[in-house]
């Protein structure tokens, strides 16, 4: 008998099918140092947070990403990358911000969501039953439309930033997810 099926980007979930995290980008070559940079930057603490919101994404990877940058590029409380930045610069700029817009990528879950949590910042995502189930134990600001985000909304949800600072990073790992999923399947 099947106790549980755990699948990444399994939009049709429920019952025995449970969402699995996509996680951070895997090393794609010997020279790919993104994971090392992430590990280094996530422990650095000497950052000021002058920005409430960081917006940085490739607008060509999904239709829903188009036009989001235009919503925030003229706000002094938002940091918007008009063009692609290096991964190291991306992490530095993320550390300068409290929240980050995380639109879906090629699939509904993407690396960005997890990078933001590893950096102890708050992802801002569009409400979706799959994502809400997957991220139910993490500080996420849920919106129906990115256009509804204002500085006041972010200020009113500052408690999520405090929660993000207290994330136990081990709980974002694949072994933790595996152990939790197996435990739930056996003892639920």
Residues covered by each model-derived region:
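Short helix-start
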Residues: 146-147
